[in-house]
Amino acid sequence: MNTDRLSQKNICDGDFKKRSDVHIARKVWHMTGVFTLFLGWTFFPNYVSLILLAIAWVVFVPADLIRLYNPKLNKTITKWFKPIMRNNELDRPAGTTYLLTGVIFIGLLFPPSVVALSLLFLAFADPIASYIGIRYGRSKIFGHKSWQGFFAAFLVCFVLTFGFLYFRGISESIWIVSLIAGFIGAMAELVPIAKIDDNFTMPVMSSVGLSFVFTFFSIFEHLK
């Protein structure tokens, strides 16, 4: 990191929210954006969703990476997105870069039903667990993660899975599948992987776990 980027960070980061802040605007942006991806994955053909995601990736990600080496561009972009940015993103790729990359990754590797449910986990379990953990997380597991946030993520993922399967006419093993999926989503939200942003790791880990569960309980056969 060069001195221009360091000095810019020192000047600006006090004006931006930290990870430990509730940051409602960011959570609303996150839920709205990821839920929109879910709707696209649900109502558009898989290849159309991937094309639209690829276009969004090409528009956003290169600019996000270039700004890290161009102080003037970085200052302009961070000023535009200040309401939804964190201070640690001033000199690192934004969460949206990891999110778009992660969704394209799972979209290429996993069935649409798994991708759709993983997007629901990311849209709602992640911000709700974060909110509960920040406001009420007195029992820490490690770092900023708490048991309160973990159980919030579990409950949200359980409810989302139950609703996802129920409205697709699947009742067989719905309770046990939903309970296991809730645990998978909560673990995906909890466990850090080599300091990679959870906007990438959560959908990937959720998709891996859900694929195993859906295969074991023959859920894919009912989703055809």
Q: What spans do the regions from the language model cover?
A:
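Interhelical loop and helix-boundary elements at the membrane-water interface
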Residues: 2-52, 65-167, 172-216, 220-223
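Central hydrophobic cores of alpha-helical transmembrane segments in multi-pass inner-membrane proteins
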Residues: 58-62
